From Swiss-Prot:
Belongs to the universal ribosomal protein uS19 family. This is Small ribosomal subunit protein uS19. The keyword Ribonucleoprotein applies. GO terms for molecular function: rRNA binding; structural constituent of ribosome. It comes from Prochlorococcus marinus (strain SARG / CCMP1375 / SS120). GO terms for cellular component: cytoplasm; small ribosomal subunit. Protein S19 forms a complex with S13 that binds strongly to the 16S ribosomal RNA. The lineage of its organism: Bacteria, Bacillati, Cyanobacteriota, Cyanophyceae, Synechococcales.
Amino acid sequence: MGRSLKKGPFIADSLIKKVEKQNSDDDKSVIKTWSRASTILPMMIGHTIAVHNGKTHVPVFITEQMVGHKLGEFAPTRTYRGHMKDKKGGR
């Protein structure tokens, strides 16, 4: 189930302030955030937001198709190295 329309989308207050400040200054520098649960809004289009994946910040360039999704969807937290070929070989 999605979030109630009455409540509106969740977005961290600090992230909103940073995006609005950059929009008013016409600044396009990278914004660092730890808020993976924040919803992408139309005002973020064209910005690069570095989303924390648990280890590093992954830069995500926001496009129109991403609006409505969460920031965490675009910064994978797990790495897949493949299954071992055989017991003797290793990786």
